[in-house]
Amino acid sequence: MIVEAAGGPLGVVVAGANVHDCKLLEQTIDSIVVERPQPTESVPQHLCLDKGYDNPTGHAAAVSRGHTPHIRRIGEEKLDKTGRKRRKARRWVVERTLGWLSKCRGILVRYAKKSCNYLGLIQLACSLLWYRRQHRFQLLR
């Protein structure tokens, strides 16, 4: 799953549990359904990834799709200018979105035998998440 900065789902790929995430990175980036502006020198498209994508395949997949990859190196923590550790990065955005989706019983326990049916159910749940976010935004205005 790929999400935007606030946790809104942008694209999802369904695969077996024994497939590593870095092998699905290109498919996941291609699954984004929202039109994005073409990256330029002044406005690049950034892609923040976790340490599991710290390999040549992860870097190449992000760059070939026009993104500037931000991948924390394995064993590296963010240090401030004095050399002390700063607050940990917010890597919980995708996990929070998966938590929202796990409230749907059909997604939490996969009853659908065909992957296309399961993908459709996930996409329906993602669209409901976007609808709820828009509805809350309208109420806050």
State each model region's role.
Residues 4:
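Short, acidic, Ser/Thr-enriched surface-loop or helix-capping motifs
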Residues 13-38:
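Active-site beta-loop-alpha junctions of metal-dependent nucleic acid enzymes
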Residues 18, 37-115:
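Helix-centered, glycine/charged polyanion-binding patches within enzymatic domains
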Residues 25, 50, 124:
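Residue-level signal for inorganic ion chemistry
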Residues 34-37, 106, 129, 133:
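Generic structural signal for secondary-structure transition and capping sites
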Residues 118-141:
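C-terminal domain-tail junction helix/linker
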